[in-house]
């Protein structure tokens, strides 16, 4: 457990080598990254997966919390582990936390990984937000939830039922408020960090053209990798491809990972 102020964070840690931090999607926990974390650890990286406040054993207040506060949680984890600046990778909502951390605490961030990132300056449209809420509503009929998840998270041919479990609606609502309280212009550029942008091929929230626009805006420090046959839930649809992209990029940051 990592404690800072009145926040206590459960951190799933594995592997040895340079640090890669994995931050999960809106209303979901660090175990979504299980197959990816295993592959990264096997590739000789130290993998840290902090559970967000309210998930697992992590606790902390939500009243008045902004994106900056969630980034401070991750800063505390990296400082506690004391293994040097980290490659901080955020899936979906986690990408904003990663970018905010790189903005506020650049000395802790070797690079930023954006996975299925909605980097636009505006929130998701109402129909998408409604589908996300339905997906996380465990009291709704499974058929309605699967339909919503298929629309907003999964590519054609993928089985959305794999995400029926693992939702934390109260955390989702609190994270959404925290994100809305912080203007997107603040974290947009991820400070001055190098950025790996992992773009799903069929994402209704984060479009391929958004990735290209982001690269044009920030220039050569952005590397875009498109993952075929995937949508917003790319980390569970294509864990091997996502892992391979992360490992290849991490090797450019640390050409010879420490043993």
Regions found by a protein language model. Name each.
Residues 7-57:
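Conserved HGGG/HGGXW glycine-rich cap/lid loop of the alpha/beta-hydrolase fold
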Residues 37, 49-89, 244:
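Active-site loop/oxyanion-hole signature of alpha/beta-hydrolase fold enzymes
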Residues 90-94, 98:
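Gly/Ala-rich beta-loop-alpha elbow adjacent to hydrolase catalytic centers
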Residues 99-104, 110-139:
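Flexible "cap/lid" loop of the alpha/beta hydrolase fold
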Residues 123-126, 138-191:
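Conserved alpha/beta-hydrolase catalytic His-Asp/Glu region
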Residues 191, 197-199:
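Short beta-strand/loop motif that positions the catalytic acidic residue
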Residues 202-206:
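Acidic catalytic loop of the alpha/beta-hydrolase fold
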Residues 221-259:
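Catalytic active-site module of serine/aspartate enzymes centered on a nucleophile-bearing elbow/loop
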């Amino acid at each position: 457990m990592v404690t800072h102020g009145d926040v206590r964070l459960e951190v799933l840690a594995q592997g040895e080598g340079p640090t890669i931090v994995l931050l999960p999607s809106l209303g979901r926990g660090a175990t979504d990254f299980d197959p990816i974390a295993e592959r990264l650890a096997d590739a000789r990286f130290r993998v840290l997966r902090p559970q967000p406040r309210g998930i697992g054993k992590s606790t902390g207040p939500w009243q008045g919390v902004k994106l900056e506060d969630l980034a401070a949680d991750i800063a505390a984890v990296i400082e506690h582990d004391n293994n040097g600046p980290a490659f901080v990778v955020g899936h979906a909502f986690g990408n904003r936390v990663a970018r905010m951390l790189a903005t506020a605490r650049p000395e802790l961030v070797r690079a930023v990984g954006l996975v299925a990132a909605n980097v636009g300056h505006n929130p998701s449209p109402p129909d998408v937000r409604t589908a996300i809420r339905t997906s996380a509503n465990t009291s709704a009929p499974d058929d309605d939830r699967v339909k919503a998840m298929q629309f907003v998270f999964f590519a054609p041919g993928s089985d959305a039922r794999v995400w029926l479990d693992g939702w934390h609606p109260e955390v989702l609502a609190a994270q959404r408020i925290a994100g809305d309280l912080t203007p997107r212009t603040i974290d947009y550029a991820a400070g001055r960090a190098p950025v790996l942008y992992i773009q799903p091929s069929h994402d209704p929230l984060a479009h391929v053209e958004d990735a290209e626009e982001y690269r044009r805006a920030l220039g050569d420090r952005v590397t875009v990798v498109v993952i075929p046959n995937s949508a917003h839930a790319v980390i569970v649809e294509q864990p091997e491809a996502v892992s391979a992209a992360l490992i290849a990029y991490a090797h450019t940051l640390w050409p010879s990972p420490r043993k």
